[in-house]
């Protein structure tokens, strides 16, 4: 399994509800249709910081998810809400345990 973590700094805090709504309504359904999709999590850390974790079977599928997310931001006209490019970390998942996430 491959994980892609994106950290977004400086997100417009006045648009948090709009952003999270659009992620849940349109981005996650698009990501879930990609080959190898295993999961997606969006984390609001506060102070204009959001992180996301995408899980896919292969690195190539993870890269495809990053391209889709970038296109999605443009298509939804959300670039101004995300003034800084994301910091992206990706790699092979070498340890995990599934459980209930609240």
What spans do the regions from the language model cover?
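Short S/T/G/P-rich N-terminal loop/turn motif that feeds into the first structured element of a domain
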Residues: 1-51, 57-71, 78-102
């Amino acid at each position: 399994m491959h994980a892609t973590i994106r950290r977004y700094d400086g997100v417009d805090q006045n648009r948090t509800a709009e952003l999270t709504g659009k992620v849940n309504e349109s981005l996650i359904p698009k990501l879930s249709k990609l080959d190898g999709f295993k999961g997606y999590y969006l984390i609001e850390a506060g102070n204009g910081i959001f992180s996301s974790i995408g899980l896919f079977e292969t690195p190539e599928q993870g890269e495809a998810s990053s391209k889709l997310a970038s296109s999605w931001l443009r298509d939804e006209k959300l670039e101004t809400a995300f003034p800084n490019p994301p910091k992206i970390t990706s790699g092979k998942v070498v340890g995990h345990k599934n459980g209930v996430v609240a």
